[in-house]
Amino acid sequence: TVARDCGFTGVQIHSAHGYLMSQFLSPLSNRRRDAWGGSLENRARALLEVIRGTRKAVGNDFPIAVKLNSADFQKGGFTEDESMQVVRWLGEAGIDLLEISGGNYEQMNMVGHPEDPAADKKPVAESTRRREAYFLDYATKVRPIATMPLMITGGFTARQSMLDALNAEELDVVGLARPLHRPPGTDERGLVVALKAFLPIAHAELNAEIDGKADEHHGKSHRNQV
């Protein structure tokens, strides 16, 4: 409700990468012997309860997304088959978007690829496209059972790869993070745009503050002289 009251238009429950909900899902980290551990149904209970509680708090018109591991990529961890079953339960819980990811901070399984400035100008081979989007194979498998839009963040670098995946309806949303910062000058351009918008306001406020302090100092000096 805090996010909604602050003007956000949705919220995501992070259940990947070894964070708390991900720890509950993984038998490698969840060693509980009560209703919250053991079977997959028990390990998924915490996440589903959080979703239900969130939905009750924010209502049906506020989007709830979940970020879920396709797998932990660790022996004895959360598996792809388990992940697909959790996707079914997430659909029953009525989430609005599923972001597919994988791994955790012990085994991220997310290795970047060298930046190719001409990537958008070259035909993208199927093998390259699959390698770019780390979890596209999983998205293809889970697509038939997913009742919510699918999002992939991780690996996309070429515009054509993104368009191909979207046009093939393998996913609905492409998430970007590092690619937005990779092109030379991206950070600088973003900073310049931000500064151009911010500096006039900051300059005016700073001048007003300086003028106010100057007037205050002048008044004190005048009183001391008197």
What are these regions (language model features)?
Residues 1-195, 199-202, 226:
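Flavin-dependent oxidoreductase catalytic cores
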Residues 208-225:
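Intrinsically disordered, low-complexity, charge-rich segments with an acidic bias
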